[in-house]
């Protein structure tokens, strides 16, 4: 299992943070390389996005499963990130890449730490399941 946590912009005086966790099972080995390339592009986008406090990535390459956990200073900035490139392209392509169980969940937190146990627990009742082919 590979895991990475990155602090982008500490939360300072912010009282409530917006957290989003995703589980991204990839349905075929042929999509792994394109997915990893896209992940690197989106990671660069994350590091330059205002309003992001921190993010974490987790990978179980053997089972083609990937997780993300992002912590945002305000919910409003998330939409700008999601609809900007390259993330917007990743969303379009994910309908082809997604395996069974791909989902995300949102919640608010006062500490906004990268807590994988909490994220995994919350993903048991996701906000949204991606439709798979």
PLM regions and their residue ranges:
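Ligand-binding pocket scaffold of soluble enzyme catalytic domains
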Residues: 69
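An amphipathic, aromatic/His-enriched active-site/gating alpha helix that lines ligand/cofactor pockets
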Residues: 75-104
